[in-house]
């Protein structure tokens, strides 16, 4: 399980000074450009955690993860002040917007944010700015969390749950570093217009500045340096101008990391290689849209999207930690959700958000222990194991956290 958290990049911070935040749909928050590390405060053992349960199974998995986080922290002498706030569809139903100002303020002033899931069929017909998913867009943009870290590891206990053959899936352990706040999702111009022939035209712009590429590349090089020393940069430099610049900047930085082996791969080939030979990858760095697609593809190698956590980090302000799965409204409220991705997101929160590596390792070890004992939610169940629900899986992890000796890292 150590592979889930096998990175030691210093992107975490001192608390930011509150900035400007103009409206719920056109946020203009600006924070000072400085490194944030909550753990940098000497002797600090009390942290403010913003909990954003969201929609669907979000409240269920957050409730379980909160208990595990609190227990692991208490065993390492940590105290948490939790502030639970509405977001996404839940906020729309409550106050009419996906990200209330009070929610954003609580998130901005916290030491770290743990989010459940956002979205659902109920709000699919809303106007774009009133869709639940826009809350996540605003949070990422305005907290300036530009680096998204998504581990994809096939645990020995779950190798048979992978969609790939055992000999292909066994031993897979990679980290995808995705640029999160630039590219085609944010580029201008964008929108749907009418051309001179009266025909509708949709425009989205893929655009990256050199500094945006450099900062995500540095995160990726540092990540690879702490893992197996291999970095693959994925682009489409044979066609896209933005990718030509991407490759140029990443290549230029490689001289600063002589201990990291850098390779380049076109995104279409990368998508194929993830299925053909996923073990060849250690650390992948790529842009926003390619990372969005490839990380979801990689998640299925592990056997279930319900197993994978993520961390979104910036140069200032709190980090955002969340499972990569969606809100799964079809199983919401039925105690069927797999809480392990959220529990492991809490472990990433401890390590990357707070610098509390021992507490993080307690959670990692507890997840492995629960799996070793045969406990499985429906998405990872196989005959011979014990089928449990969301709550019981959380309880088993909690028992394992309590029974473990002090963690060493």
Swiss-Prot record:
SUPFAM superfamilies: Isocitrate/Isopropylmalate dehydrogenase-like (SSF53659). Changing residue 232 to S: Reduced sensitivity to oxidation on enzyme activity regulation. Mg(2+) binds at residues 268, 292, 296. Substrate binds at residues 140, 150, 178, 268. The record marks 137 as: Confers substrate specificity. Optimum pH is 7.6. Its cofactor is Mg(2+); Mn(2+). Disulfide bonds: none annotated. It is an enzyme of class 1 (oxidoreductase). Homodimer. This is 3-isopropylmalate dehydrogenase 1, chloroplastic. It comes from Arabidopsis thaliana.
